[in-house]
Amino acid sequence: MRYYLGVDWADQTHAVWVVDEQGAKVASRAVPHTAAGLSEWGRELDEWRAQGIELWTAIERPEGRVVDFLLDHGVVVYPVNPKALDRARDRFRPSAAKSDPFDARVLAEFLRTDHRHLQALQPSSEAAQELKYLTEDYRRHVRQQTRLVNQLTATLKAYYPRALEVSELTTALARQFLQAYPTPVAVAALTQKRWQRWARAHRLSNARAQELWGCLQRPQLPVPDHVVRAKARLMLTLVEELTAVVAAVGQYREAIDAFFAGLPAAQWIRTLPIGDHGVTAPTLWALLGDAPRRWESWQHLQGHAGTVPVTIRSGQQRVVRFRFACDKALRYVVDQVAFLSLGKSEWARAYYDQQRARGHDHRPALRALGAKWLKIIFVMWDRQIPYDEQHHLATMTRQQLRQRGQKKVA
């Protein structure tokens, strides 16, 4: 016997709807997101399982505390795409009405009738999940760093554009310069001797110090004093925030590298020809996970990463378009792998150049190369084996010879 649960999660209270195999309602409840609320619900789930009832749950998000809770209680979890849920709502309503209990009911019924089209969540090991959280938080810090750099750039352009020529804003040199000389007036008051002293203290070469001195002495458009005062205050605030975020990005990078180095998967994933490039390899493995049978085939992996297009057929029409629905984080890291391999892999460079020669722009050519890499990465992941460039080149040569032979026979 099996019960189908629909869970519409929320920050405070989760709506739950339960139906049996015939679609008859078994129960519905609101579960407070508290220790007591989840504990009470957990007892109910355990009682059902003790009676020999199999529990399947549909939920919109594939991770989080509620998902962990359900897995801990032996519930099979099926993540449902929000777009699929939105379309399923129309089966049960004539209007656009919406509520949390209604969504929970739709999830339960959708799982009961369409579970053959869904894939049960295959949780990775705790180590893989921890690495995934680390890499996700790292990317959040990188995005925050980018936002602050953009804000700081816009602020300096408004009153102090010469300061942008000192160095990249993510460097300590640029931020220390801005803190020491926050306005054009402060720079104008500098003597060359004082500047040389500051440059030596910050380990600038004589040539670079002279170049910057000439740059800072060039006049800029006058800016009203009240604008300078306001923008200088904002600039110093942004510099403090950016300094903290830059430090956090570096700390996360070190933590990810150290954590990943202790995992067995590092021995094969680091053999990809991408060089020692930051967190690319750890992020790739974290997104792949280590749950058995998570990826059914390399085609499944390609579709999830969005490296292959979508084909739409209707009558005599056939349209091939870009795949928008995919794991954006995985798409990005596969693009990174493809790009970094251009300077490290002979066949990757040749394939990319071939795509460009056919008229494809950089992004489509890189995406096509990423699709090729995912075929290789799937085999590496499935068999836990390292990458061998020479073996792959030999395999490609045999395939090309076989294809030529088939053409001659034809």
Identify the role of each PLM range.
Residues M1-A410:
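A detector of single, family-specific signature residues
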